[in-house]
A protein has these predicted regions:
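Extracytoplasmic/lumenal domain signature
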Residues: 1-199
Length: 199
């Protein structure tokens, strides 16, 4: 194997990179965390950099920055895989970002795929490590869920970020959820796996 392009992200990339093939080209969406830039007292805050690249050339298409708090034992920034919108939310990519105001909170953002501009931004009282999940209902509308450090799963409208419902998972959630038909399955620190019915 031979690298054809390299980009210095300035920090760790723990969140899975997502790829999209369109009529305009093939693109990557990615975000880093706040880790190496804060080591040994170098910084108490740094930006989580959300970026879109041309997947074939490495050209940076756009970048959106969100300031995060550095914590030596738990990293801020993006750790979960973003939602790559499709169907009725095909214009957006959605990221959850940890520690955007303190070492306990977070932010969920939906960005326009073409421009990187914010479509909506939602302040999270508790940060989220796990990947958000989108799914389509029987009426053809897309919904999304995410789980947080406080042990709750939230149902959102991805068009505007509005919370529609929530349920307790009894402990912090690091795992990413899976869905089959109308049942979401996820594990938590409660040492349990939950099957959540969505209506």
């Amino acid at each position: 194997m031979k690298p054809v392009w390299i980009y210095d992200t300035k920090d760790d990339t723990d969140a899975t990179i997502v790829i999209e093939e369109t009529d305009e080209g093939v693109f990557l969406y990615t975000a880093n965390q706040v880790d190496k830039r804060g080591e040994n007292g170098k910084a108490t805050v740094a930006d989580c950099n959300i970026r879109k690249f041309n997947a074939l050339t490495g050209e940076l298409i756009w970048q959106k920055d969100y300031q995060c708090v550095y914590n030596y034992y738990i990293n801020g920034g993006a750790l979960g895989t973003p939602i790559l919108g499709k169907d009725d939310i095909s214009n957006m990519v959605i990221f959850n970002i940890c520690f955007t105001g303190s070492n306990s909170d977070g932010t969920m953002v939906a960005l326009d795929k073409k421009t990187g501009n914010e479509i909506w931004k939602k302040k999270l009282a508790s940060y989220s490590w796990c990947s958000p999940l989108d799914f389509k209902s029987s009426d053809g509308k897309t919904y999304m869920v995410y789980s947080d450090f406080a042990g709750k799963m939230y149902l959102l409208d991805p068009m505007n970020g509005k919370t529609l419902d929530s349920v307790s998972l009894e402990g912090n959630v690091e795992s990413s959820p899976a869905i089959y038909n109308d049942t979401i399955v996820v594990g938590s620190y409660a040492r349990k796996i939950f099957g959540i019915k969505v209506k």
